[in-house]
Curated annotation (Swiss-Prot):
Homododecamer. GO terms for biological process: amino acid biosynthetic process; aromatic amino acid family biosynthetic process; chorismate biosynthetic process; quinate catabolic process. GO terms for molecular function: 3-dehydroquinate dehydratase activity. It comes from Mycolicibacterium paratuberculosis (strain ATCC BAA-968 / K-10). Keywords: Amino-acid biosynthesis, Aromatic amino acid biosynthesis, Lyase. This is 3-dehydroquinate dehydratase.
Length: 143
């Protein structure tokens, strides 16, 4: 099974941007961790990051068309993008929303997610391990 792992705005800056909040793992290191865990679980992970909402929408539309599960950390678009929510609602395979930090323990504006109502589940505040937990969940589910 192919799993789309999609990271949104500013996540390409992991390891440099607010390491006290997001840790010191870079996006390249995160991608390698995800790909290794996916392979160990018999999955193939396609890990992508973009600061462009349009590109994220294209990737989610592609996953919907291919009936592929998605692990999505939409970054700040989680709290602002109805368009991203609508694209995610089109998915028939599972959607797991992931956030590295505990968004519920941060600023008030981060506590609302447009994605959670259309997601299968959400993993927040467990650092980069959240992605690996999402993969383990998907490995136990048929797509």
């Amino acid at each position: 099974m192919i799993v789309q792992v999609i990271n949104g705005p500013n996540l390409g800056r992991l390891g440099r941007r607010e390491p006290d909040v997001y840790g010191d793992t870079t996006h390249d290191q995160l991608a390698a961790l995800i790909e290794a865990e996916a392979a160990a679980l018999g999955l193939k992970a396609i890990v992508r990051q973009s600061d462009s909402e349009a590109e994220l929408l294209d990737w989610i539309h592609g996953a919907a068309d291919a009936n592929q599960p998605v692990i999505l950390n939409a970054g700040g678009l989680t709290h602002t993008s109805v368009a991203l929510r609508d694209a995610c609602a089109e998915l028939s395979a599972p959607l797991i929303e992931v956030h590295i930090s505990n968004v519920h323990a941060r600023e008030e504006f981060r506590r609302h997610s447009y994605l959670s109502p259309v997601a299968t589940g959400a993993i927040v505040g467990l650092g980069v391990q959240g992605y690996l937990l999402a993969l383990r969940y998907l490995a136990g589910r048929p797509a």
